[in-house]
């Protein structure tokens, strides 16, 4: 949605909503109300939000934290920004505890028939698309944004013979990912605490690098650095795939201005992402072929390849 496409009244409404949200007490009130509504919706769908958070918050996470945390990961300011209504963004236990239940609640509007399992359906669709891209399954896979392991475990199911590495910049998420892996009996090879633009992994060490809902949370400069880093990690014939918001989707093009403003208040780099020409940026980063295709009413899948 461009600024020019907004009607004057919608533009004014958006401006007023934005100004109201900039007032901290009003933002806190709006955030608390939105949170209550989200939890209520989740629990009506059978998603045990409060029960899950209560159970996870009682655990001693120090041993797993010590396993995944890596000293020296210097997080730039954009990684410490507020996201999704959490003041500490992705760098807090609350975000980690609530990640899976919140994902199912948010994506239930896309797959209402799936109810409490809507996020699984969303990820499964993306990974089925990936399977179609590989006549021969990739042997070495990197999940560039593991969070608590949801996309990593789906990659493991889609490509059971592959060696899979999960990476994330948030040690809170990775601690939960390691826990979830143990609960599921997962054979994920390693959990890596690193920035996606500075992984520290070897050149050409993966046949497939995948990222799920990462780039709408990144400034443009960071996205460009990530693209270059991924290109470094891929050998000839390697593939980079990601799923993210589709700016051309009718869901965003027709979204009421005040709703879009509310959404952007929890996604500080969404405008930056919507302004990127992904195809041109990937070609500039050294990829040879780029395919972009819608895969849900709100998302697209991007496949970028390196020639053999």
Briefly describe each language-model feature range:
Residues 11-98:
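N-terminal auxiliary segments of SAM/dcSAM-dependent transferases
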Residues 102-139:
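Conserved alpha-helix/loop element of class I SAM-dependent methyltransferases that forms part
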Residues 140-198:
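Class I SAM-dependent methyltransferase SAM/SAH-binding core
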Residues 224-236:
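A short glycine-rich, Lys/Arg-flanked "PGG" loop and its adjoining helix->strand segment in the class I
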Residues 224, 241-285, 289-294:
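C-terminal alpha-helical "lid/dimerization" subdomain adjacent to the S-adenosyl-L-methionine
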Residues 302-308:
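C-terminal lobe and adjacent flexible extensions of AdoMet/dcAdoMet transferase-like proteins
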Residues 207-221:
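A short SAM/SAH-binding and catalytic strip from SAM-dependent methyltransferases
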Residues 197-209:
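A short acidic, Gly/Pro-enriched loop at the edge of an enzyme's catalytic core
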């Amino acid at each position: 949605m461009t600024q020019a496409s907004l009607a004057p009244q919608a533009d004014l409404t958006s401006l007023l909503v934005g100004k109201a949200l900039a007032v901290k007490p009003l933002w806190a009130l709006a955030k608390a109300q939105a949170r209550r509504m989200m939890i209520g919706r989740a629990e009506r769908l059978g998603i045990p939000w409060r029960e899950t958070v209560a159970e996870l918050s009682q655990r001693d996470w120090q041993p797993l934290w010590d396993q995944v945390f890596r000293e020296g990961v210097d997080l730039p300011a954009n990684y410490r920004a507020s996201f999704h209504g959490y003041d500490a963004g992705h760098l807090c236990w609350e975000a980690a505890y609530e990640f899976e239940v919140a994902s199912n609640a948010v994506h239930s509007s896309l797959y209402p028939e799936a109810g409490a399992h809507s996020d699984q359906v969303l990820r499964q669709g993306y990974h089925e698309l990936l399977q179609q891209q590989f006549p021969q399954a990739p042997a070495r896979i990197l999940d560039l944004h593991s969070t608590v392991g949801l996309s990593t475990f789906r990659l493991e199911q889609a490509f059971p013979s592959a060696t899979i590495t999960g990476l994330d910049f948030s040690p809170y998420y990775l601690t939960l990912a390691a826990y979830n892996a143990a609960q599921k009996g997962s054979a994920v090879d390693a959990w890596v605490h690193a920035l996606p633009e500075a992984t520290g992994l070897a050149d050409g060490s993966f046949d497939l690098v995948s990222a799920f809902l990462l780039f709408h949370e990144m400034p443009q400069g960071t996205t460009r650095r990530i693209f270059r880093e991924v290109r470094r990690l891929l050998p000839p014939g390697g593939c980079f795939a990601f799923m993210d918001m589709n700016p051309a989707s009718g869901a965003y093009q027709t979204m009421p201005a005040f709703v879009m403003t509310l959404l952007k208040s929890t996604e500080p780099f969404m405008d930056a992402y919507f302004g990127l020409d992904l195809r041109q940026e990937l070609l500039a980063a050294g990829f040879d072929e780029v395919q972009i295709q819608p895969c849900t009413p709100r998302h697209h899948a991007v496949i970028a390849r390196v020639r053999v």
